[in-house]
Amino acid sequence: MSESAELTELYSAIEETTRVVGAPCRRDTVRPILTAYEDVIAQSVISFRVQTGTSDAGDLDCRFTLLPKDMDPYATALSNGLTAKTDHPVGSLLEEVHRQFPVDCYGIDFGAVGGFKKAWSFFRPDSLQSASDLAALPSMPSGVSENLGLFDRYGMTDTVSVVGFDYAKRSVNLYFTGASPESFEPRGIQAILRECGLPEPSDELLRFGEEAFAIYVTLSWDSQKIERVTYSVNTPDPMALPVRIDTRIEQLVKDAPLGSAGHRYVYGVTATPKGEYHKIQKYFQWQSRVEKMLTADAG
């Protein structure tokens, strides 16, 4: 199959998935992104994501992971005019992480409406990194340093598997895949959210958290507080999870194209100052190498 045919097939899958979940699909937004990353799409893992209750709820997000470590995904976005260059620290953080840490591969997120949004740096499961070391980077939000005590208390500090860079919202995600068992128990979830100044978790989140394998936190440069905490679950059957399934999530699960990945999903519940929202990531294109990384690819 030629590269152009491959892109046409992928665009058709994105377009069909947006139709299924009732989201727009802007060809003039999506096609330039596919073209910019054309050389690495065949070897990547591809997934589609929807969420509820946020400013992004009307968009379909697409994710490419397993991008090669010698590729700077943000530089590619800049050179292809997919995002504007910025003097904000978010614009230099990925390069700092790449220069000082053993990044194994990269990823990107883009919306069928919103365009290029995020990049990701993945560490190998046998080479998890320290939040203390990441906090020392010049461009890292100071909130990482301010919350090292919390990370220590719940066995999270030395278990960072992914760093996410949200260029659209100017925030950072730290993914922890080795937190203490207590972190997933109802008391632990309540304590973590309380320390973050977030509302008490719903009973739904407490039940869901007991099945989770990873936690990630969102921080920005505007505050030293953790803005959001997300618990993630790997599942072949999201409909069986102990949560109320939103209509758009159900549509993605039941009606969107399967691709080569079959029935593979990551479901997340996020706690915010304004309440909780849900998200789901449906894998479309699979690579066998991702099996060991799946615990790090947490929605």
Curated annotation (Swiss-Prot):
Gene disruption phenotype: Mutant can form only nonprenylated phenazine 1-carboxylic acid.
CDD domains: PT-CloQ_NphB
EC number: 2.5.1.121
GO biological process, one term: phenazine biosynthetic process
Cited InterPro entries: Aro_prenylTrfase, Prenyltransferase_CloQ, PrenylTrfase-like_sf
Domain of life per record: Bacteria
Keyword match Disulfide bond: no
Record keywords, A-Z: Antibiotic biosynthesis, Prenyltransferase, Transferase
Activity regulation, free text: Does not require magnesium or any other divalent metal ions for activity.
Pfam families hit by this protein: PTase_Orf2
Protein name: 5,10-dihydrophenazine-1-carboxylate 9-dimethylallyltransferase
UniProt organism field: Streptomyces anulatus (Streptomyces chrysomallus)
